[in-house]
C-alpha cells in the first residue's frame, strides 16, 4: 500500500516521535513516524507526478490544524490511540483534491496516530488492547501533549513495501 502523508513540523515532530517511541516500548508495539495520512494511492504511481504538481501550486502548506481530542478506541490497529484534528477548510481542500487526483477511496477523519496495536516483533494485531486500556493510554498521551494546534507540511509518498502491517518496511519513496 502506498499513501501520501503530511508530517508535523520541527519541535512538534520531535515531541510526537519521542511519545510514540516511548509508548511503543512500554506496550511492546511497533514504533512509526508521526504523520497525518492524506490519502492512499490505490493504483499506478504515475499519478504521483500530478499530486506533486498540485502540492507545488496549491499554496496551502503548511497547514495549521487544531487538536480536538486525544482518543483511544478499538477501531483498527492503525487507529487505536490518536490525536483527532480539526478538518479545517484548508485541510479538507488539500485532502479532497489529492484524493481526486490519485483516485483514492473516501477519506477517514483526519488524525495523527500515537499507538498502533501491532506487536513489536510479529507485527500482528494484538487482541489484548481493549477499549479501556486504549482509553487509559490516550489519557496519558493527552497529559503530555501541550500543543493545541499542529503545523503539518513536508508531504511525502510512503510505501508499505511488504504490506500495510509491515510497519518496519514502510519507506518514504518521494517528497512532494
Briefly describe each language-model feature range.
Residues 1-68, 84-146, 151, 163-176:
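Basic, often amphipathic N-terminal segments
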Residues 156-158:
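Active-site-proximal alpha-helix that buttresses catalytic centers in soluble enzyme cores
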Residues 72-81:
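Short, basic/glycine-rich phosphate-binding loops at helix/coil junctions
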Amino acid at each position: 500500500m502506498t499513501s501520501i502523508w503530511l508530517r508535523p513540523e520541527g519541535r512538534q515532530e520531535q515531541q510526537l516521535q519521542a511519545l510514540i517511541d516511548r509508548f511503543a516500548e512500554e506496550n511492546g508495539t511497533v514504533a512509526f513516524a508521526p504523520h497525518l495520512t492524506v490519502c492512499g494511492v490505490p493504483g499506478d504511481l504515475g499519478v504521483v507526478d500530478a499530486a506533486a504538481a498540485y502540492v507545488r501550486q496549491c499554496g496551502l502548506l503548511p497547514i495549521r490544524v487544531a487538536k480536538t481530542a486525544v482518543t483511544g478506541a478499538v477501531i483498527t490497529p492503525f487507529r487505536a490511540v490518536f490525536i483527532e484534528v480539526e478538518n479545517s477548510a484548508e485541510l479538507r481542500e488539500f485532502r479532497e483534491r489529492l484524493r481526486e487526483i490519485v483516485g483514492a477511496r473516501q477519506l477517514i477523519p483526519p488524525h495523527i496516530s500515537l499507538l498502533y496495536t501491532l506487536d513489536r516483533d510479529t507485527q500482528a494485531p494484538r487482541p489484548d488492547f481493549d477499549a479501556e486500556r486504549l482509553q487509559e493510554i490516550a489519557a496519558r498521551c493527552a497529559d503530555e501533549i501541550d500543543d493545541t494546534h499542529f503545523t503539518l507540511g513536508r508531504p511525502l509518498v510512503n510505501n508499505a513495501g511488504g504490506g500495510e502491517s509491515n510497519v518496519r518496511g514502510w519507506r518514504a519513496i518521494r517528497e512532494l
